[in-house]
Amino acid sequence: MGCKIKLKNAFKGYTFDQDKIVSPEETVGHFKNRLKTVNLDILEETVRIDNGRLDIPVYFSVCGRDALEIIGTKKQMGKGGTPSQSEASAVMELAERFSFFSFWKNPANFRLDTYKNVKGEALSFEAIAKSVHDESGELDKAREIFENLPLKWTSGCNLTKDREILIPFDWFFAINEFNGPSAGNCVEEAMSQGICELVERHTSSIISREKINVPAIDLDTVTDALTRELIGKYKNAGIQLFASDFSLNTGIPSVGALAYDPTTF
């Protein structure tokens, strides 16, 4: 069966530091308008909470009663180069968390079964074994046990092969909890962000696990205007800022940043 997700062109309508189909102001407006159409208390308010030292905007999106019950936490943080970007980030964090935990808590989204019964439709055992770095040489024994474990399976899309497959949701949730939920102005935006979140976690975990020396990035070579402005705000506050290239061999840019205040050391 082909994927239910069908990717389409999503033309950029906003390109100030971010590539989005609409501006952050439109994102926030659309989000709040959508909330008016559902009989749920999801968003209580958005609040700017940065203390002004860096002058880099940070927002909270504070959960309403129903969102708090579903998510279990009171607020989400959003950040951006401008106040509107930061507020949009905060409300989209709320959107993705509310959607994710709503999905997780709905039994209708899952099929409780064993790998033995679903393997013709499911992610391969070999791929599942790689998720826990099993190099024991005893995969045959592990397979015998795994095949009989009752797991919660849910439908996913193999974009490479354009087909639906079953994913052992609780297996991956036990390992990584919610790794890569993402929201966007359209499916393509959300998917791009989710894939990039997985890449950054993947590369940073490899670098940390294997203690890989990676190239430093000379911040004086940065040419993007807003990025230079943000770097300048750290310098003006007396905070040391370092960046490293975490891309490894993925072909997808990933950057690690470290900031520290010398007055606290």
Give the role of each language-model region.
Residues M1-F265:
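Helix-coil modules at protein/domain termini and other flexible surface or pore-lining loops
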